[in-house]
């Protein structure tokens, strides 16, 4: 069957407005937020679950590769093509039009459709005094709920662990090339795919149709796991087979139509403590004591190094300001606008590369100072910063412990944040990742590339702060260290000097991490940046025996039936 026939059939399903074949207009869908870009025959944007199913069926019949994509906010290029060396044509299915969030069991659980975002879920749950698995970080840039599940996304919240569920509705292509719809949501929705998908979309089910004994809606064991600080393995990482279950961790090897998740009580009272020190052992002691001895685990414990603080202060200022003034729901629209501006800029040779970044960086120079003086004072005094958020009884636990541990000032300092300092500290921490990208765009003549590593250290690793050998360090302009300290998950961004082979540099760094017993990636998943470990490759092969959904992920083969 011809390409023209395929495009015609897809157009019949969604209408001409929602199929894009012009390469200049598909670029935003074919390019990752940080990494990955490649060709695609078309980008298709279904509005319903049934349209989604029919599109996948047509793609299977035409023997084309399917890459399912939601918000496309991943940092490792896992929901876009990567290069043009595939053995079949590619269709990208963007599911953001299929939004829908259904609260069940008195809002203690939720059904999320492919286009639902963490930000939307957070807003829907607030009136019920509940919140989703992740509420900061990925939620700020419009990440989808299902994208988080498919990638076992981690996030900042210590008490909840990686995004995980055992309840999902998905399509799987079996070894015979037959597409099967599997309803493991635990809800009686009918027998045929048409019945199941339509009934779910229109919420045509009753309380009696919902089973309560059909699996976990989050990782129930992580709270205990993260407290085991003497263990010689990481608390969480993407290749951990204990957290691979159907849709959970599938990385696009299934077409996921819905997931059923647990929600969590919203903390009525919280407090944030800002800690600064010049001794890494001080932060190790704090982490160990809080995880082992506190009755209540921290809500979050975010680390930021002074250099990352500086880069974010200068190159993340406008992102910080937009979130503070308008809220996170504006960011997806702004990212879309940014893509369109850059696309237009490429058409005119007299306009600079990275037009939107350069414009916004100029604008940011006229934005008033955004960080409180207290944060700047700690930046000037201390190299290492830890932002700890506590709730309930944990607030008093933290107050008493920090007052006794940092009593004389020899170990460092701390203060309990007021409302302005709390917001500023949190937003500043999450501006770091985008700030590195901005730095690369502004200094393109000096920067070869960013090597961005997502690392899970051993729970018992005392030497958590990296010291690079001179032969590596000499090739780097700046190193940005930040992460989820209580979980020992670190994001390490290296801005590489112009002229150096950044891929070779990354290879050398990964070898150093191997010697330390670290795992990578920790929570961003392999995408097209990391090589999938054997257990992860096995999981992908089991889910997608014909290798038709998102082939090449984790640097695996892109060929049909996993041919090498």
From Swiss-Prot:
Annotated FAD binding sites: 70-74, 78-79, 137, 144, 154, 256
Pfam families documented for this protein: FAD_binding_4 (PF01565), Lact-deh-memb (PF09330)
InterPro entries: D-lactate_DH_C-sub1 (IPR016172), D-lactate_DH_C-sub2 (IPR016173), D_lactate_DH (IPR012256), FAD-bd_PCMH (IPR016166), FAD-bd_PCMH-like_sf (IPR036318), FAD-bd_PCMH_sub1 (IPR016167), FAD-bd_PCMH_sub2 (IPR016169), FAD-linked_Oxase-like_C (IPR016164)
Cellular component, GO, one term: extrinsic component of cytoplasmic side of plasma membrane
Domain called FAD-binding PCMH-type: residue spans: 36-207
GO molecular function term, any single one: quinone binding
Swiss-Prot/TrEMBL GO biological process terms: lactate metabolic process; respiratory electron transport chain; transmembrane transport
Taxonomy, superkingdom: Bacteria
EC number, UniProt record: 1.1.5.12
Main location (coarse class): membrane
Membrane topology: Peripheral membrane protein
Subcellular location: Cell inner membrane
Keywords: Cell inner membrane, Cell membrane, FAD, Flavoprotein, Membrane, Oxidoreductase, Quinone
Catalytic activity: (R)-lactate + a quinone = a quinol + pyruvate
Cofactor dependency: FAD
Family: Belongs to the quinone-dependent D-lactate dehydrogenase family.
Functional note: Catalyzes the oxidation of D-lactate to pyruvate.
The name this protein goes by in its record: Quinone-dependent D-lactate dehydrogenase
């Amino acid at each position: 069957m011809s390409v023209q026939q395929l495009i015609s059939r897809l157009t019949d399903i969604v209408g001409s407005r929602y199929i894009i074949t012009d390469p200049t207009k598909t670029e935003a869908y074919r390019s990752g937020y940080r990494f990955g870009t490649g060709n695609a025959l078309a980008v298709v944007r279904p509005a319903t679950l049934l349209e989604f199913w029919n599109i996948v069926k047509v793609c299977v019949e035409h023997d084309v590769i399917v890459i399912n994509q939601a918000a496309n906010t991943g940092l490792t290029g896992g929901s876009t093509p990567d290069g043009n060396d595939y053995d079949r044509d590619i269709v990208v299915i963007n599911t953001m039009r299929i939004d829908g969030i259904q609260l069940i069991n008195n809002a203690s659980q939720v059904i999320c459709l492919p286009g639902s975002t963490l930000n939307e879920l957070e807003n829907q749950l607030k009136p019920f005094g509940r919140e989703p698995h992740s509420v900061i970080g990925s939620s700020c840039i419009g990440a989808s709920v299902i994208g988080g599940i498919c990638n076992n996304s981690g996030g900042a919240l210590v008490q909840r662990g990686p995004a995980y569920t055992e309840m999902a509705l998905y399509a799987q292509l079996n070894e015979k090339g037959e597409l099967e719809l599997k309803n493991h949501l635990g809800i009686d929705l009918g027998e045929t795919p048409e019945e199941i998908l339509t009934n779910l979309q229109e919420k045509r089910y009753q309380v009696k149709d919902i089973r309560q004994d059909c699996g976990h809606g989050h990782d129930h064991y992580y709270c205990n796991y993260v407290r085991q600080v003497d263990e010689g393995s990481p608390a969480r990482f993407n290749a951990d087979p204990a957290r691979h279950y159907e849709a959970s961790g599938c990385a696009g090897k299934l077409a996921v139509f819905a997931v059923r998740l647990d929600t969590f009580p919203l903390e009525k009272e919280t407090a944030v403590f800002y800690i600064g020190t010049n001794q890494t052992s001080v932060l190790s002691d704090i982490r160990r004591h809080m995880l082992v001895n506190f009755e209540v685990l921290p809500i979050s414990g975010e680390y930021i190094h002074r250099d990352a603080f500086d880069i974010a202060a200068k190159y993340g200022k406008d992102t910080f300001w937009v979130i503070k003034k308008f809220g996170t729901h504006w960011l997806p629209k702004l990212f879309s606008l940014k893509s369109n501006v850059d696309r237009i800029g490429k058409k005119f040779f007299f306009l600079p590369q990275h037009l939107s970044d350069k414009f916004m960086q100029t604008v940011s120079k006229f934005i008033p100072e955004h960080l409180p003086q207290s944060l700047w004072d700690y930046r000037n005094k201390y190299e290492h910063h830890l932002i700890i958020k506590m709730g309930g009884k944990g607030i008093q636990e933290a107050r008493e412990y920090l007052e006794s541990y940092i009593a004389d000032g020899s170990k460092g300092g701390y203060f309990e944040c007021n409302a302005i300092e709390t917001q500023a500290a949190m937003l500043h921490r999450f501006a770091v990742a985008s700030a590195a990208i901005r730095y690369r765009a502004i200094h393109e003549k000096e920067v070869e590339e960013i090597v961005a590593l997502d690392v899970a250290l051993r729970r018992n690793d005392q030497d958590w702060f990296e010291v690079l050998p001179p032969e590596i360090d000499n090739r780097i302009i700046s190193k940005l260290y930040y992460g989820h300290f209580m979980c020992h998950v670190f994001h390490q961004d290296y801005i590489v000097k112009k002229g150096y082979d950044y891929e070779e540099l990354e290879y050398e760094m990964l070898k150093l991490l191997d010697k330390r017993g670290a795992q990578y990636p920790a929570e961003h998943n392999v995408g097209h940046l990391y090589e999938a470990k054997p257990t992860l490759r096995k999981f992908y092969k089991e889910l997608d025996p014909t290798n038709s959904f998102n082939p090449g992920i984790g640097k695996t083969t892109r060929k049909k039936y996993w041919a090498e």
